Amino acid sequence: MPEQKAPQDLQLILDDIYRELTPRLGEGKVADYIPQLARVNPQHFGMAIVTTGGEVHRVGDAEVPFSIQSISKVFTLTLALGKHGENIWHRVGREPSGSAFNSIVQLEHEGGKPRNPFINAGAITISDLILAGHTPKELIGEIVRFVRYLADDENIVIDHEVARSETVTGFRNFALASFMRSFGRLDHPVEHVLGVYFHHCALAMTCSQLAKAGLFLAAGGTNPLTGHSVVSRQRARRINALMLTCGHYDGSGDFAYRVGLPGKSGVGGGIMAVAPGKASIAVWSPGLNENGNSLLGSLALEMLAARTGWSVFGP
């Protein structure tokens, strides 16, 4: 059985991964259907690890903010579970979709109930759920405050240019939301729900901030650096389970096979991954693979899991 790596070894592992991937920087295809994301330099690469013992390790562009996009769905799901508990599962499923993240076909076939909270239709439903009793502006503010609380960092903001860019070009998301509204699956006006959705997807964070924000999922629901209790141990375990099975769109099975860690990707090129009991990891490389997941980010996490023995399926 491979020996578990001590924290002091993690920086060496990160440095090695960065050095080995440097010749491949720029590989993959930057998301071009959101104009602001299409302008991002594909040569960027950053990675950060925050251990449950408080060690912070980073490499490359780990302090450069980027658009976290669908990674934000982990945070809105956590908020929804806090507000509504297990009742949310009447509105959204817990199964992998096997289809593209913005597919309408499956939604029609299944009566407007999204397969899981991490595909676009599912996250739009979650936005509708947590909008109850709020104006869109109030809820957007609450989401930002919640993510700042998780990361213990008041500098996290929404990139309003990205939010505006998505609002102008997000025709497929308008179609998904309108479709669910036609099935009686949304309680609020489509424009209000999507206003929330586009803005939380436009959160800008660094790898270091993102790794800190996900640390509660690695430590049984409580951030060990701040003492902030976020969710119960059982709920943290269940969020991790959903990230493992559904966190990478229709590439989730391959990510579980290669990396073996709960994780959530975004088309901005970021991935937040969790090694339960050990660490939270964030990686950013804008070039995407055919499933819309970071090509080099996925490879970096595969290398990290292999060298640390952190896969949840065993070293």
UniProtKB/Swiss-Prot annotation:
Alphabetic keyword roster: Hydrolase
GO terms assigned for molecular function: glutaminase activity
Residues that span the membrane, as ranges: none
List of residues binding substrate: S70, N120, E166, N173, Y197, Y249, V267
Gene Ontology biological-process annotations: glutamate biosynthetic process; glutamine catabolic process
E.C. number: 3.5.1.2
Reactions listed under catalytic activity: L-glutamine + H2O = L-glutamate + NH4(+)
Disulfide-bond pairs as recorded: none
SUPFAM superfamilies in the record: beta-lactamase/transpeptidase-like
InterPro entries per UniProt: Beta-lactam/transpept-like (IPR012338), Glutaminase (IPR015868)
Xref: PANTHER family: GLUTAMINASE
Quaternary assembly: Homotetramer.
Family named by the database record: Belongs to the glutaminase family.
HAMAP family according to UniProt: Glutaminase
Name the UniProt record assigns to this protein: Glutaminase
Lineage summary: Bacteria, Pseudomonadati, Pseudomonadota, Alphaproteobacteria, Hyphomicrobiales
